Curated annotation (Swiss-Prot):
Name of protein: Chaperone protein ClpB
UniProt function note: Part of a stress-induced multi-chaperone system, it is involved in the recovery of the cell from heat-induced damage, in cooperation with DnaK, DnaJ and GrpE. Acts before DnaK, in the processing of protein aggregates. Protein binding stimulates the ATPase activity; ATP hydrolysis unfolds the denatured protein aggregates, which probably helps expose new hydrophobic binding sites on the surface of ClpB-bound aggregates, contributing to the solubilization and refolding of denatured protein aggregates by DnaK.
Localization: Cytoplasm
Region (Repeat 2): 84-147
Residue segments, region Disordered: 1-25
Native organism taxonomy: Bacteria, Bacillati, Actinomycetota, Actinomycetes, Mycobacteriales
Naturally occurring in which organism (per UniProt): Corynebacterium diphtheriae (strain ATCC 700971 / NCTC 13129 / Biotype gravis)
Comp. bias intervals (Polar residues): 1-13
ATP-binding among keywords: yes
The gene coding this protein: clpB
Amino acid sequence: MAGFNPTTKTQEALQEALQKASAAGNPDIRPEHLLAAILGQEDGIAIPVLRATGVDPDVVRREAEALVAKLPKAEGANLANPNFNRDALSVLNNAQELAGELGDEYVSTEVLLAAVARGTNDAAELLTKRGATYDVIKGVFPSVRGNKKVTTESPEDQFQALEKYSTDLTARAREGKIDPVIGRDQEIRRVVQVLSRRTKNNPVLIGEPGVGKTAIVEGLARRIVAGDVPESLKGKTLISLDLGSMVAGAKYRGEFEERLKAVLDEIKSAEGEIITFIDELHTIVGAGATGDSAMDAGNMIKPLLARGELRLVGATTLDEYRKYIEKDAALERRFQQVFVGEPSVEDAVGILRGLKERYEVHHGVRIQDSALVAAATLSDRYITSRFLPDKAIDLVDEAASRLRMEIDSSPQEIDELERIVRRLEIEEVALSKETDAASKDRLIKLRQELADEREKLGELVARWNNEKGAINKVREAKEELERLRSESEIAERDGDYGKVAELRYGRIPELEKQVAEAEEHTVETTMLSEEVTPDTIAEVVSAWTGIPAGKMLQGETEKLLNMEAELGKRVVGQSEAVVAVSDAVRRARAGVADPNRPTGSFLFLGPTGVGKTELAKALAEFMFDDDRAMVRIDMSEYGEKHAVARLVGAPPGYVGYDQGGQLTEAVRRRPYTVVLFDEVEKAHPDVFDILLQVLDEGRLTDGQGRTVDFRNTVLILTSNLGAGGTKDEMMDAVKRAFKPEFVNRLDDVVIFDPLSQEQLTHIVEIQIAQLAQRLAARRLTLAVSDSAKLWLAERGYEPAYGARPLRRLIQQAIGDQLAKKLLSGEVRDGSEVHVDADLDNDGLVISAS
C-alpha cells in the first residue's frame, strides 16, 4: 500500500496474516487475521499494550483464531496470495493516520492494534467486548512507550527497555524472594554514603568471589523496601541490569548501543528514582564494541556517571577490577571503591543462622545450630581455595540436599527386605514346577517364609510412609509459615494493620505451635533422619576434599591404634620410623596437632634398601588403600637451580606458565595425601628454600599466585646421607648438606637401621606373598618351603645394599625359572607351584602339581 511505512515487526505481522489467510483457505486478508498475527508476536509491543488495558492477550488471541476458523473458505488459484479486503485496508489507513498523529515515522504493531479496534469489523467488536476500545488502547501508550517516538524500524528495543533488560530487586524484596542479609552493616552504610553524594555517586563493591558482594546489594534492596535508609534513598527503585540479555540477539551493528541507550534514557527520565546495579561490572568494558570502534558500554555510561545522572552500584572481583577497570583511568575515577573482605568464622556462623530457616523450608529438614558452626569451621579449615560465607552456605545446602534425598529414597532395611522377597519369589516359581517330595516340602516352608517376609516388609513400608508423611507435613507447615510472615511484612508496609494483627497474633502463633508439636512427634521416628548434624557436614567435606573430617568410627579408631602393626606388615625392622609416622597421623586425626602445619614432616636417613621409600608407600596404602595414592617427587630430576620452577610452575612470561607445578597442582587436586621427596640429597640446595614455608606454615604459593594448602599432607624426605656411619656421623652429614633453618623445621629426623639376617627372613615372606599375588591372576598357587626361604634369606643378605639384592635374587631364582616353565608348558594355569631348596647345587627347584 502506497505511503504505508511499517516497522520490521509490523511487516512480519502482515506476512503472518497473509499466511494465516492462505492456510485457512480464506479468499482475502481480514482484520481478524491481522489481530491473530499481531498477538502471536511474543516480543512485540502490542502484547504489553493490551495487557496494560487489563485484557489477557492469550484469551483474545484464541478468540481471534476462532473467528478466523469461522471465516468463509474458497477454492482457486488466488488462495496462495490473497489480497487485503476493504476492512483490512481501512485498518492500515487508520494505522498510518494514528502514526502521524503520534509523530512516528513508522507504523508499529501497537498502533496497528489500535487501528483494528477503531474499525467496525468482528475483530474490533471482539476487542471492544473485552474492554480494549480504541480510546483505551491509545490511552495506555504513554505508560508503555513513554514519551518515545517510533523513529527506527525496530522500536521494540527502545520501549520498556528496563523491563526487558533488568530485574527489579526492590520488587523481589517486597515479594520476600531475597534471602536476609546478616551483618555487613558497615559495607551497606558505606554504599549508602556514596549513593547519597551529589556527583560520582557510584560505589563499586570489590572483593574475592563468594564473600557476599551481590548479597550486600540485595541487603540494600531489602532496606529500601523497609524504609531503613536515609531520605535521599527512600522510595527508590533498585534494578539489576542484565548486560547478557542486552547483547544477546543484537544482530546488526548499533543494535546493542540502541538497546543500552534506551535503558539509559529510561533511567535518566526517572530523574534519580532508579538506582542501577551491574553484577560483574568489568563486563561493561568492551561490551558491544565492534571492529575498531571505541564505543562500548563503558564509554557510553561515562558521561552519565560523571554528571550523577546515573546512580550505579557495581560488583566485581579484585583481579577483574585491576585487569579491566583500572586500565581505564577515566572510568575508574567515576567509581568509589568499597572493599568487601571475607567475614570471620564467627560472622559466617551469624550469616548461616540468618539463612537457616530458608534452607530448612526449601529442603524440608531441620538444621542443628552445631551443624552451622561445623560448616563455618570445617570449610575455613579444609576448603582453602574458596571464601566464606559462600563455601559454608554451600556445605549446609548440600548436606540438607543429601538428607532430603535419603528421606525420599527407600531406607536400607526396606531395600534389603525387598531383595529377600524377590529372591524367595523366584525360588517359589522354580520349586512350583518340581514334583519330588523334597521340593514340595521346601515349597511349603518357603511359602510360609515368604508370607512372613512380606508381612514384615508391609509393616516397614507403612511405617516409612507414616514417618515420611509426618516430615512432609512439617515441611508444608513451615512453607505456609514463611508465606504468612511475608504477607504480614507486605501488609505492614501497605498500612493494613488489621491484617497484620490477624496474622501476627492469630494465624502465625497458631501455625508455629503446630510446627513445634509436629517436630516433637517426628523426633521419635527412627527409620528416617531429618536433622542436619555436624557429622552430615563432615561427610560432605570428606566428599569434596577427600579429607576425613568426620568423627572416627569404631573400626577406624582400632585401625589407628594398631597402626604400627599395620605398617610393620610391609616395613620390617624400623620400629622407630614406624612409631614416629604413626604418632603424627594419630595426632592429626585426634585433632591435637597444630592445624597450621603439615600433618607430619620427616627426613628418613639410612643406607639404601632398608625401607625408607617402602614406609611412604605403606603409609599411603594405610591411609588410602592404595600405595600409589601419593605424590612422588624424584629429587634427582631437580639437580639444576632453575628446576625449582617445575615444582611450583613457571613464572609469568615463561613457557608453561598456565600449566601449574608438578608439586602444587598435585596437592591442589588432592589436599589429603602423602608427599614423598625421594633422594633429596641429589637435588640442588636452592630447591629446599621453597619448602621452608611448606614445613612451617603448611602452604606454598605457586607460579600463578595461588596459595596451595599443605596442612593435610604428610611430607616424607628420604636420603642416604652418611649411610654406614654412626647416628652422630649421619646427623653431621645432614647439617653439612642442609641449611639449619630447613632441618629445624622438620618434625623429626628418623634414622633407619641396617637390616639383620633375622629381619631379612620376614622380608622374604613379604616378597614371596607379593609374587604369589601376581601369580594368582593365572590361577597359580605358590608354596615355598622353609628351607627355600632360609636359602633366599642367606643368599640375599648384603648389609650394604639392604633388601634390594633379595628382590633380585627372588626374581632370578624363582621368577626366571617359573617363566621358562610356563612358556614351555611344564607348568599350566591353575597348577600348584612348589619351590624347594636344592642344597647340593646351591639353588632352588621348582615343580608343579
